[in-house]
Amino acid sequence: MRIDKGGALEVARGFAALLQAERFDEIVELFAPPLRAAVSAEALRLAWAAQAAGHGGVRAVEEPASQAGEADPVRVHIPVTCANSGFTVVTSVGGDGLLHGLRLDPHGGAEWHPPHYADTARFTERDVMLGTGPLAVPGTLSLPVGPGPWPAVVLLSGGGAFDRDESSGPNKPLKDLAWGLVTRQVAVLRFDKATFAHPDRLPQDFTMADEYLPPALAAVRLLRQQPEVAPDRIHLLGHSMGGKAAPRIAAADPSIAGLVLLAADAQPMHEAAVRVARHLAALAPGPGAEEMVAALARQAALVASPGLTPDTPSKLLPLGFSASYWLDLRAYDPVATAAGLACPMLILQGGRDYQVTVADDLARWQNALAHRPEVTIRIHQDANHLFFPGSGHPTPAEYARPGHVEPAVVDEITAWLARR
């Protein structure tokens, strides 16, 4: 029997009570199968701990409220009060009584506003579709006003279920970049990830290669067909995991003219996950934080061990990723792949980034590539992982405050592309 809106709110109240008690193993039992495959108890525990640490610790999980006008699924917002502001748990309760979506959003409802360096009178945008079949994804093509032909970039967002703008709370860093670059006469194509557009269609053996290569290569082909785009000046611009994936995409299409890597992670991701968890645990120390780090370290050790097989259950692995995903990641070395490419590269890193760091990630790119004249590597000392400016000890709470990619980053990318 399917439940109505009142029943959906009852499910949400039970979910909220489990969140308050931090009973994450029981929470995942409420997930619909696609969500359960994508988000493990440990991944949820880590995300919850990150939000709690960034806001000074959770004080209370409040009464759920449904979004007006929705019947199936019912969108529900659950406010979480913290010592410093708070955040909102957003979920969708289906008529089957299960949770079909989940994200943690900052409080405040702040809307994105264009950065001062974007001028909407200087470009046009249109919707596009990349690929065919069940995992085809929608995107946006931004073209400068004028005949061109212009240099172009394909934007690649970071790890997770991101839309084409890499939206997170009030911020849209990829939209900042897209509008900033197209204002400066660079064509830009950005797209929703399949993990965002089709979370219920992902195969069990889905990998990072499946996540990034098909839409990115389709984007390059589409740009090459545009008369306003110079076909020999199409580049990839990847942020975070998008930067990690960019050399792999370029290796699959030698026509790609160059790479721009922003906070591209190079440390093996299972190791980085433990490092970041330790950073977050230090912000809100306690037995729960220690247990979270220890559990994640055990999962990471399994990823690194010969015992990892395609049949290893995802609940035993970090971040809820499948064994196939981890096996693919383990076999891929982004730095070695980049070293095998002949194309020019611009590698930028934020000095205040605690997710991808100068010591753990940029050093690997520098050791392999800094001697090459066609590779430029720069650190923006005041920038965090999103390349937003800031100061002091970096925390997740920064991501909840409205901000924009630093103008200097947009200008540096534009100048680098102009020289290609």
Give each language-model segment a name.
Residues 354-360:
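Conserved alpha/beta-hydrolase "acid-adjacent" motif
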Residues 109-148:
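N-terminal cap/lid segment of alpha/beta-hydrolase-fold proteins
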Residues 146-180:
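Short, surface-exposed "cap/lid" segments of acyl-processing enzymes
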Residues 341, 347-349:
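Short beta-strand/loop motif that positions the catalytic acidic residue
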Residues 258-340:
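Accessory cap/linker subdomain of secreted extracellular hydrolases
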Residues 383-387, 391-420:
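Catalytic active-site module of serine/aspartate enzymes centered on a nucleophile-bearing elbow/loop
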Residues 9-10, 25-71:
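Short solvent-exposed beta->alpha transition segments
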Residues 205-227:
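Alpha/beta-hydrolase active-site loop
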